[in-house]
């Protein structure tokens, strides 16, 4: 049930009846719930457009919709608001439908093919905290769009091609390590040494470039080593994905190497279409849409003098593939803000070349950085980048210490399980609860707190409801009486449950998981107020008990579904 959209449509229909069209009513939750659960916020603006006084326009709108069953009362308040108090009986009817629905009453939408480009680690390097935001924010979007019925194509655009592989293959050859057992940790060490050697040893650099050319030309020996490096890396990355409880699998890997064979044809095609030109041995696209420091069209190099290709070339090919082969209707990129201009340029070139439709939805969902308390990039004490595995290890250890203090008699197996769920969940929620467009301060104490907008607080709210339901000893099949709402805290909780669909739909458009975190926190606090003000297990009447149990079940289901969409697990006891 999308209450905001329902109210908005009622207002639009009322405006059409009084000959006011092309207006966009802004509906918000009302903080003063005694006069209205929702309110029209831009009445004054609409009144100015229609040359009516706000009070006069409000009366006309109210007159046209006040008889609808879903509204208990519609009122005007100064200086220019319309307040909508929802009928408790109507709310109860909607809750009954949701109670019987395995999808919490949320319908499927018209399906699109949506490619989500996220995570994207590099080969021969361990994942670090810089990969966290892209991985978990992108995964929330994938889960939500999946739930709504879209065909979601997860694209883990790994960096599995380029000069670094020539360096690494050459180094493994020189050190006679090709047939040795290799771990990802060792590969990263060898890569760092290979890079240093490449910068100071001209012969080694030439050998590295030779291997790059051989690899690009399909040399079987180089290809077999490359494949081994990719396999070792992705095996470890998939372990991280499993620990993070994200839905990325090995089958979702779509590395840069996929598009390698397309690149020569794209260069020729762009030259034939007069989009690209050769200058000083390089192939360049000059874009008037972008200006350099001198105010001239910016040049985008798509092939170097040595005939090597660049990231821009790969991204143009990638766009073509996703549109023409995967038939994407919408492509969403989860990379940091530094990639924004680069992506815009690739999109512009692909459109000029007619590789993609002008109507293809292209979105770059940028995100900020994770900072330490001193507001600097979050690193180890030695100044090194923190490995993602180390971060998750510490989260689990910290959660374990907290749980031991609260439940010292837990079995080792249960302790490990709980520590993992709560620790990893806390890290994810701390990130997801922040607006992705901003940087945020990483704080262990805050994220593992059982108070405030944190994963442990939401998880605990769920376990408390599970405990209440267990104490009731009332099977769900016996809860046949209708939900009825009399107290304000019951109605406010019910309204909050009904809000879930509009939150999910909003995130599906904006890609902003912090909105869902905020909603779940408010849902949990609404339940807490309900619990404090309404006896659930021991009211005067049995039908009141059953009604409140159903309301509790709906709250638990919504909390669980919301956390699931965030990729965070629940527990039945904490």
Curated annotation (Swiss-Prot):
**Localization annotation:** Cytoplasm
Give the GO molecular function terms: arginine-tRNA ligase activity; ATP binding
Keywords, in A-Z order = Aminoacyl-tRNA synthetase, ATP-binding, Cytoplasm, Ligase, Nucleotide-binding, Protein biosynthesis
Chief localisation class? cytoplasm
Which stretch is the leader sequence? none
The record's listing under SUPFAM superfamilies reads: Anticodon-binding domain of a subclass of class I aminoacyl-tRNA synthetases, Arginyl-tRNA synthetase (ArgRS), N-terminal 'additional' domain, Nucleotidylyl transferase
Which Gene Ontology BP annotations are present?
arginyl-tRNA aminoacylation
Cellular component (GO) terms are: cytoplasm
* Pfam families with a match to the protein in the record: Arg_tRNA_synt_N (PF03485), DALR_1 (PF05746), tRNA-synt_1d (PF00750)
Q: What is its EC number?
A: 6.1.1.19
Superkingdom per UniProt: Bacteria
- Asked whether the keyword ATP-binding is assigned, the reply is yes
Catalysed reaction, written as an equation:
tRNA(Arg) + L-arginine + ATP = L-arginyl-tRNA(Arg) + AMP + diphosphate
Q: Where is this motif: 'HIGH' region?
A: 121-131
Q: Which family does it belong to?
A: Belongs to the class-I aminoacyl-tRNA synthetase family.
Q: Which PANTHER family match?
A: ARGININE--TRNA LIGASE, CYTOPLASMIC (PTHR11956:SF5), ARGINYL-TRNA SYNTHETASE (PTHR11956)
Q: How does it assemble?
A: Monomer.
Which NCBIfam families does its entry note? argS
User: Per its record, how is this protein called by name?
Assistant: Arginine--tRNA ligase
Organism in which the protein naturally occurs: Buchnera aphidicola subsp. Acyrthosiphon pisum (strain Tuc7)
């Amino acid at each position: 049930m999308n209450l905001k959209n329902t109210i908005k449509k009622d207002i639009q229909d009322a405006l059409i009846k009084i000959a006011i069209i092309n207006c966009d009513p802004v509906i918000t939750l009302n903080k003063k719930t005694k006069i209205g659960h929702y309110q029209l916020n831009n009445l004054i603006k609409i009144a100015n457009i229609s040359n009516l006084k706000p009070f006069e326009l409000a009366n006309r709108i109210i007159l046209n919709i006040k008889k609808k069953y879903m509204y208990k009362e519609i009122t005007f308040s100064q200086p220019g608001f319309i307040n909508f108090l929802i009928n408790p009986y109507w709310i109860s009817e909607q809750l009954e439908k949701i109670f019987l629905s395995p999808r919490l009453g949320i319908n499927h939408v018209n399906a699109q093919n949506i490619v989500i480009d996220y995570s994207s680690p590099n080969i021969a390097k361990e994942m670090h905290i810089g990969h966290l935001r892209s991985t978990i924010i992108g995964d929330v979007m994938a889960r939500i769009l999946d739930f709504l019925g879209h065909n979601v194509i997860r694209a883990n655009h790994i960096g599995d091609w380029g000069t670094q592989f020539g360096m690494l293959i050459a180094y493994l050859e020189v050190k006679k390590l090709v047939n040795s057992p290799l771990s990802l940790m060792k590969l990263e060490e060898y890569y760092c040494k290979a890079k240093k050697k490449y910068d100071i040893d001209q012969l080694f650099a030439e050998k590295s470039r030779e291997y790059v050319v051989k690899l690009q030309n399909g040399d079987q020996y180089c290809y077999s080593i490359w494949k081994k490096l990719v396999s070792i890396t992705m095996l470890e990355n998939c372990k991280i994905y499993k620990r993070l409880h994200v839905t990325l699998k090995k089958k979702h890997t779509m590395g840069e190497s996929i598009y390698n064979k397309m690149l020569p044809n794209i260069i020729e095609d762009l030259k034939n279409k007069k989009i690209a030109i050769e200058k000083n041995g390089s192939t360049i696209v000059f874009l008037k849409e972008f200006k350099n420091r001198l105010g001239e069209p910016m040049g985008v190099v798509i092939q170097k003098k040595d005939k090597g290709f660049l990231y821009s070339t790969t991204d143009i090919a990638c766009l073509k593939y996703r549109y023409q082969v995967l038939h994407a209707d919408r492509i969403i990129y989860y990379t940091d803000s530094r990639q924004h201009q680069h992506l815009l340029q690739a999109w512009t070139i692909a459109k000029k070349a007619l590789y993609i439709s002008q109507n293809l939805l292209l979105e770059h969902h940028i995100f900020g950085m994770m900072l330490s308390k001193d507001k600097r990039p979050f690193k180890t004490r030695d100044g090194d980048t923190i490995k993602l595995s180390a971060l998750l290890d510490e989260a689990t250890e910290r959660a374990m210490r907290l749980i031991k203090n609260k439940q010292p008699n837990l079995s080792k197996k249960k302790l490990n399980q709980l520590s993992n769920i709560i620790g990893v969940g806390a890290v994810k929620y701390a990130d997801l609860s922040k607006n992705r467009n901003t940087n945020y301060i990483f704080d262990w104490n805050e994220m593992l707190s059982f108070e405030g907008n944190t994963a442990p607080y939401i998880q605990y709210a769920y376990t408390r409801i599970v405990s209440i339901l267990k104490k009731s000893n009332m099977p769900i099949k016996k809860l046949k009486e209708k939900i009825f709402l009399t107290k304000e805290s019951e109605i406010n909780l019910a309204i909050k449950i009904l809000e879930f669909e509009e939150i999910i739909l909003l995130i599906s458009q904006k890609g902003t998981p912090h909105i869902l975190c905020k909603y779940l926190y408010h849902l949990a606090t609404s339940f807490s107020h309900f619990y404090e003000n309404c006896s659930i297990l021991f009211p005067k009447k049995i039908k009141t008990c059953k009604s409140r149990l159903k309301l509790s079940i709906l709250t638990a289901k919504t909390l669980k579904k919301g956390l699931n969409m965030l990729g965070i697990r629940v527990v039945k006891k904490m």
